[in-house]
């Protein structure tokens, strides 16, 4: 029996919309990352982007458990000496709610060009509205 290898031009990609309201951040992000990679499909091939497009709505209503809202810290660097910046989860969810889900999912995707291609298929919106109605996304319950 010959091993099946998916071809990038023959992969069928669907659009799904996920409501993040009341969902736990890590559990939601791991399922989204798995869908972006295409691991739920029978034709999954590790070196080919076989994943679907995922639209996340209500990103501002995602939750974390325990004390993580005050304790979880996100770091970035300005590339200048002494330029490390930090912000906690509860401040970031108010300022840029999309970034919380994007960073969680991005950390679960592979590094390199293939991971960046998978990450580009993620669309995150703070509110309940999105502008991908033309793609006719299906509702995905996670």
UniProtKB/Swiss-Prot annotation:
One of its GO terms (molecular function) is structural constituent of ribosome. Keywords: Ribonucleoprotein, Ribosomal protein. GO terms for biological process: negative regulation of translation; translation. It comes from the Bacteria. InterPro entries: Ribosomal_uL13, Ribosomal_uL13_bac-type, Ribosomal_uL13_CS, Ribosomal_uL13_sf. GO terms for cellular component: cytosolic large ribosomal subunit. Belongs to the universal ribosomal protein uL13 family. This protein is one of the early assembly proteins of the 50S ribosomal subunit, although it is not seen to bind rRNA by itself. It is important during the early stages of 50S assembly. Part of the 50S ribosomal subunit. PANTHER family: LARGE RIBOSOMAL SUBUNIT PROTEIN UL13M, RIBOSOMAL PROTEIN L13. This is Large ribosomal subunit protein uL13. The gene is rplM.
